[in-house]
């Protein structure tokens, strides 16, 4: 077996900790010791070896103990894992099932494990070319199998596709193991004292890495379905309190949401938290500060805030601050005023970061903006269907940023920079200001630039809006952006909640919004 599977085997079998899984139907937490989870993984491996020994296994479903076990089960059987999301609310079951199986086939996955309603939906369509197995059956055969050695990948991870078509990153067992070890080393994970709590989806790199890093450490982990969080976001705080969690992770919008409506919070204890990772989307310094201040009466230590940087191409984490420092904000002053950016820490062990400015690399702490390039032991082997990348080469991320005294600062995506009248404007700065307007939905704002041929040339802000007075909200938004960003939007487009296109991981697809606006002209 791979070193990744071997190390996880030793950690899970020796662990005294538990995997606690929330049953969304009953709202009860089910306890599963990590050795039990590994036993289920061995059963899954035996099932896979009895069914054509697939090179890759697809997983779809809620984050049950069986699904978590199936990840290690696939690795014990020498197979790669690819996890895809379930249907969103309002989706057509047949179209979702067809699209999911088509995506699996497109990346070479011909064996899929699922359970419950997801399994029934997948089996309701034409499954030619795909073996669909019942995960509940596969995990409970009470059998074990001799682990299979494999030189193949461990994970076929979909990328976000927020600025283009999504691709599939090929992650080797060594890359995954290096990233998990680097993350645990940076935050100092200790199975004897730490408890993790997560609602992040396992098909997303941050959600998968959080679960696997806990398994690698043998640390207790409380795992809730993402749908349980979206149905009632403030339950997250109750889960943190009930579990005595010391570690959690979420994208920026979740912290903003809690901080914005903190008056709803009562009778929780967040005093144990020492690591609250913030990643997956741009960090709002003001919103994160508001969260920390609002949670302070409930024992939250602002030093636990860890705004971080990562991407699927590097397995997950690239830079993470040292716990205890808290949010560091770097101020940049230009012609439009002062702007705050979160400092995202230094590279985790095994990774390197540099800033490319044309034909040369910017020096450390030079604060010169350029494209962020990375390399290291956590890097992907390449994109599926494309040439492998040289592990010694620097990988251009497409993100713009600079290196400050406290580490990496990310300014935005190179493809999304708005150039107007000789100025470069990062859309996230405009979006954070626009989101402060009453009625504008948190995390549902897109700022983009349109060309001279558009009927609305210049800066356009599109936002999901729910409120009684669009006219006043539009005027306030324009005034705020003009005052704080130094540019006047040429147009503000309000759309109904849920209208802006997103990726499967929930990131806004800015280029898709641009195309839809151009088509409407």
Swiss-Prot record:
<dbReference type="GO" id="GO:0008922">
    <property type="term" value="F:long-chain fatty acid [acyl-carrier-protein] ligase activity"/>
</dbReference>
<dbReference type="InterPro" id="IPR020845">
    <property type="entry name" value="AMP-binding_CS"/>
</dbReference>
<protein>
    <recommendedName>
        <fullName>Medium/long-chain-fatty-acid--[acyl-carrier-protein] ligase MbtM</fullName>
        <ecNumber>6.2.1.20</ecNumber>
        <ecNumber>6.2.1.47</ecNumber>
    </recommendedName>
</protein>
<dbReference type="InterPro" id="IPR045851">
    <property type="entry name" value="AMP-bd_C_sf"/>
</dbReference>
<keyword id="KW-0547">Nucleotide-binding</keyword>
<dbReference type="GO" id="GO:0006633">
    <property type="term" value="P:fatty acid biosynthetic process"/>
</dbReference>
<comment type="pathway">
    <text>Siderophore biosynthesis; mycobactin biosynthesis.</text>
</comment>
<dbReference type="InterPro" id="IPR042099">
    <property type="entry name" value="ANL_N_sf"/>
</dbReference>
<dbReference type="GO" id="GO:0051701">
    <property type="term" value="P:biological process involved in interaction with host"/>
</dbReference>
<comment type="function">
    <text>May play a role in virulence by supporting bacterial growth in the liver.</text>
</comment>
<dbReference type="InterPro" id="IPR040097">
    <property type="entry name" value="FAAL/FAAC"/>
</dbReference>
<dbReference type="GO" id="GO:0005524">
    <property type="term" value="F:ATP binding"/>
</dbReference>
<keyword id="KW-0436">Ligase</keyword>
<comment type="function">
    <text>Activates lipidic moieties required for mycobactin biosynthesis. Converts medium- to long-chain aliphatic fatty acids into acyl adenylate, which is further transferred on to the phosphopantetheine arm of the carrier protein MbtL.</text>
</comment>
<comment type="similarity">
    <text>Belongs to the ATP-dependent AMP-binding enzyme family.</text>
</comment>
<dbReference type="InterPro" id="IPR000873">
    <property type="entry name" value="AMP-dep_synth/lig_dom"/>
</dbReference>
<keyword id="KW-0067">ATP-binding</keyword>
<dbReference type="GO" id="GO:0070566">
    <property type="term" value="F:adenylyltransferase activity"/>
</dbReference>
<dbReference type="Pfam" id="PF00501">
    <property type="entry name" value="AMP-binding"/>
</dbReference>
């Amino acid at each position: 077996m791979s070193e990744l599977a071997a190390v996880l085997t030793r950690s899970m079998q020796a662990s005294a900790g538990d995997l606690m899984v929330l049953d969304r139907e009953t709202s009860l937490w089910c306890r599963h010791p990590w050795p039990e989870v590994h036993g289920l993984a061995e059963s899954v491996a035996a099932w896979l070896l009895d069914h054509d020994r697939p090179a890759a296994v697809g997983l779809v479903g809620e984050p049950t103990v069986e699904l978590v076990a199936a990840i290690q089960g696939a690795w014990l059987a020498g197979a790669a894992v690819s996890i895809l999301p379930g249907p969103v609310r309002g989706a057509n079951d047949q179209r979702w099932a067809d699209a999911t199986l088509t995506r699996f086939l497109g990346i070479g996955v011909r064996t899929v494990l699922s359970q419950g309603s997801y399994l029934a939906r997948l089996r309701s369509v034409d499954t030619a070319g795909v073996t669909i197995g019942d995960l509940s059956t596969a995990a409970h055969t009470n059998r074990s199998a001799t682990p299979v050695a494999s030189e193949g990948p461990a994970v076929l991870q979909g990328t976000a596709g927020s600025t283009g078509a999504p691709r599939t990153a090929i992650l080797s067992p060594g890359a995954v193991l290096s990233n998990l070890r680097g993350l645990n080393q940076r935050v100092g994970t200790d199975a004897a004292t730490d408890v993790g709590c997560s609602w992040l989806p396992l098909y997303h790199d941050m959600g998968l890495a959080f679960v696997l890093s806990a398994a690698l450490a043998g640390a207790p982990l409380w795992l809730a379905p993402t749908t349980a969080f979206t149905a009632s976001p403030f339950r997250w705080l109750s889960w943190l309190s009930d579990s005595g969690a010391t570690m959690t992770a979420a994208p920026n919008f979740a912290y903003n949401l809690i901080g914005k409506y903190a008056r709803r919070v009562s009778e929780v204890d967040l005093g144990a938290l020492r690591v609250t990772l913030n990643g997956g989307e741009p960090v709002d310094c003001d919103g994160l500060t508001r969260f920390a201040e609002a949670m302070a009466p409930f024992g939250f230590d602002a030093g636990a805030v860890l705004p971080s940087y990562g991407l699927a191409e590097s397995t997950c984490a690239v830079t993470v601050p040292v716990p205890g420092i808290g949010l560091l904000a770097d101020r940049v002053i230009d012609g439009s005023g002062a702007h705050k950016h979160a400092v995202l820490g230094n590279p985790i062990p095994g990774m390197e970061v540099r800033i490319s400015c044309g034909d040369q690399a910017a020096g450390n702490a030079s604060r010169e903006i350029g494209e962020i390039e990375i390399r290291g032991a956590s890097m992907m082997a390449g994109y599926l269907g494309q040439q492998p990348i040289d592990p010694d080469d620097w990988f251009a991320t497409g993100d713009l940023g600079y290196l400050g005294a406290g580490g990496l600062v990310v300014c935005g995506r190179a493809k999304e920079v708005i150039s107007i009248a000789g100025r470069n404007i990062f859309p996230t700065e405009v979006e954070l200001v626009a989101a402060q307007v009453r009625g504008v939905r948190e995390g549902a704002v897109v700022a983009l630039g349109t060309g001279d041929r558009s009927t609305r040339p210049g800066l356009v802000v599109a936002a999901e809006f729910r409120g009684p007075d669009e006219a006043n909200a539009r005027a306030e938004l324009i005034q705020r952006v003009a005052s704080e960003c130094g540019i006047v939007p040429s147009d503000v487009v309000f759309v109904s909640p849920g209208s802006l296109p997103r990726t499967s991981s929930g990131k806004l697809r800015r280029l898709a919004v641009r195309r839809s606006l151009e088509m409407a002209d």
